[in-house]
């Protein structure tokens, strides 16, 4: 019987030879593997300082992905907005940053300061004690020069506040960076107005985890050596006299030198017209007149505050920054480190707080409907104060418009492109202006509020240049358009009606207010100096120009018509008023002292000529 095997002998031999070849190849490759070199003794970690963790041979540690920090504003944008106030004294700077988070309150305070130019210092703070503003805004009305500067650019105020709410540590870093630039150019130095103090921040030891190389036993050794961070320089600014505050005013393009990022030029707040700023043209740096105050400055900046856990208090529901968060160790700040002087704070607000270690916290109730920069910031600060703490309110679900706007913001941050102004943005801006108009309190007419805002120095210079470069025909055309403009005519008629319907007491009060206004007094003094220093030829040319003006001719014609249409009784009353006021003017020392002999003789001649003409009539 013939037996058939399932495998042929030669096939079995071939399979066995292939197995032997594979085994020999594996042994050869293993014998050629290079072992990892042993570290020198000086770099090995001590077993007593290391923690041993054993892993299976087939398991490898996953790679560590660094956390991505989301920034709402770039460094160039923050430098652009911080530049006008980085050289302010620390206390004043901190309160400007706090107040900028309430743009509507600032707008109302600017208008109040404009309507009350004689109020400053502690008296101004007492006058606004009943206003529904944050304490930081109330404190700034003590400095009318500062309010005039902040009123020049409301959009800058809101941008600065949004940056401070979103990235307080970046704002403080920008302050130090810009102060170092100003110190390098020689613009920032101690003076009679303020002290510049440069200190070296203590080196902070930081523990860093180091992972040792993998050894054949599959054991990972970790240690925590102490590494010292390099020391940093901190520049702080304080008033030379704590009871007198000077408002700095400077041109950022001069004091900081060449600006690094020309795509984001620094914001410049020129000194407003009529505000006394003593400027130094050498350094491009000047100060306002000193303002005496005892409690207007109630905050300070702790530049050395590295321990974020010591700001934990029992009444943290009001005076801590919303940018922080709570954990098991206490309150964590985002780097703002603004501390509050409770005594001065209580004098401004009328409260009776007793905690001596308080830090500032943004209060959304004083935002007055002004939207926050983005949805994340709105979630953080869309809260309402209630008894027992803070209660967050539910925000509406994101819509397509909000998602589209968020995508556009992310694209702008990545590419640094100019923002795209969409219809939704325009609607939001219009709604914001409407909300601001509703919250102006006694200044509820937003159009009148914007029209009453003082012109900036740049606008005045541009208007002056246009007027000087215009031809006589162009000036005449502008005058005619103004005379025929129905709106201007309505304003004239309304003013004329108010004057005619005013009582003698009201007219006298207006005259006294105009006479005691320091700006009007300065203008009168400047005009008087120009007249006294003018030559006879210049005066004659000016008289001819005045006589040739059609408006003056029209005024003379109108006056002549009123005189001709007046009744004898009205003329008699007018003559009596003139005769009563003439001796008072001639005997007034303020007028006679300024006149020389020639001017007095000229006045007497004109009076005699007028008397002769009246006798002829």
Swiss-Prot record:
Bias type Low complexity, positions: 404-414
Region (Disordered): 387-419, 443-599
Biased composition (Polar residues): 387-396, 453-474, 549-570, 586-599
Signal peptide (residue range): none
Superkingdom per UniProt: Bacteria
Compositionally biased spans, kind Basic and acidic residues: 490-499, 522-531, 572-585
Protein name: Uncharacterized protein YacH
């Amino acid at each position: 019987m013939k037996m058939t095997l399932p495998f042929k002998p030669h096939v079995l031999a071939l399979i066995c030879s292939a197995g032997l070849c594979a085994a020999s190849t594996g042994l050869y490759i293993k014998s050629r593997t290079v072992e990892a070199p042993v570290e020198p003794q000086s770099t090995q970690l001590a077993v007593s300082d290391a923690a041993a963790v054993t892993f299976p041979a087939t398991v490898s540690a996953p790679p560590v992905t660094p956390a991505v920090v989301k920034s709402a504003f770039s460094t160039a944008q923050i430098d652009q907005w911080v530049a006008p106030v980085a050289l302010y004294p620390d206390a004043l700077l901190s309160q400007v940053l706090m107040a900028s988070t309430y743009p509507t309150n600032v707008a109302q305070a600017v208008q109040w300061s404009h309507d009350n130019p004689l109020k400053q210092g502690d008296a101004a703070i007492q006058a606004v004690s009943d206003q529904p503003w944050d304490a930081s805004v109330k404190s700034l009305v003590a400095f009318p020069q500062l309010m005039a500067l902040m009123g020049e650019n409301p959009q800058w105020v809101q941008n600065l506040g949004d940056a401070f709410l979103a990235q307080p540590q970046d704002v403080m870093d920008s302050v130090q960076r810009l102060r170092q630039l100003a110190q390098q150019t020689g613009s920032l130095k101690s003076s009679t107005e303020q002290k510049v103090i440069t200190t070296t921040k203590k080196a902070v030891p930081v523990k860093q985890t180091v992972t040792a190389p993998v050894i054949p036993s599959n054991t990972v050794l970790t240690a925590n050596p102490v590494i010292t961070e390099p020391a940093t320089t901190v520049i702080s600014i304080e008033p030379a006299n704590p009871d007198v505050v000077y408002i700095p005013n400077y041109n950022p393009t001069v004091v900081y030198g060449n600006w690094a990022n020309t795509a984001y030029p620094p914001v410049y707040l020129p000194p407003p017209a009529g505000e006394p700023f003593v400027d130094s043209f050498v350094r491009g740096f000047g100060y306002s007149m000193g303002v005496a105050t005892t409690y207007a400055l109630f905050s300070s900046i702790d530049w050395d505050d590295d321990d974020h856990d010591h700001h934990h208090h029992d009444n943290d529901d009001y005076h801590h920054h919303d940018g922080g968060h709570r954990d098991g160790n206490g309150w964590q700040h985002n780097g703002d480190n603004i501390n509050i002087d409770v005594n001065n704070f209580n004098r401004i607000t009328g409260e009776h707080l007793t905690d001596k270690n308080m830090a500032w916290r943004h209060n959304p109730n004083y935002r007055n409907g002004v939207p926050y920069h983005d949805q994340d910031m709105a979630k953080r600060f869309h809260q309402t104060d209630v008894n027992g703490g803070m209660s967050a309110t539910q925000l509406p679900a994101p819509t397509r418009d909000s998602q589209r706007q968020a995508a556009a913001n992310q694209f702008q941050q990545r590419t640094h492109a100019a923002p795209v102004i969409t219809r939704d943005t325009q609607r939001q801006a219009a709604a914001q202006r409407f909300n601001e108009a509703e919250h102006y309190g006694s200044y509820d007419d937003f159009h009148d509020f914007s029209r009453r805002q003082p012109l900036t120095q740049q606008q005045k210079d541009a208007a002056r240049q246009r007027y000087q470069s215009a031809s006589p025909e162009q000036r005449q055309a502008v005058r005619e358009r103004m005379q025929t403009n129905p709106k201007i005519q309505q304003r004239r008629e309304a003013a004329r009606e108010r004057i005619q319907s005013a009582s003698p007491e009201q007219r006298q009060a207006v005259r006294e207010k105009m006479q005691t206004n320091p700006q009007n007094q300065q203008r009168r003094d400047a005009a008087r100096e120009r007249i006294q220093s003018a030559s006879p030829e210049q005066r004659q040319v000016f008289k001819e120009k005045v006589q040739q003006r059609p408006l003056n001719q029209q005024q003379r014609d109108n006056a002549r018509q009123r005189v001709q249409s007046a009744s004898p009784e009205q003329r008699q009353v007018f003559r009596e008023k003139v005769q009563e006021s003439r001796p008072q003017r001639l005997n007034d020392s303020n007028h006679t002292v300024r006149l020389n002999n020639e001017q007095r003789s000229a006045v007497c001649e004109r009076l005699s000529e007028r008397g002769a003409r009246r006798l002829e009539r």
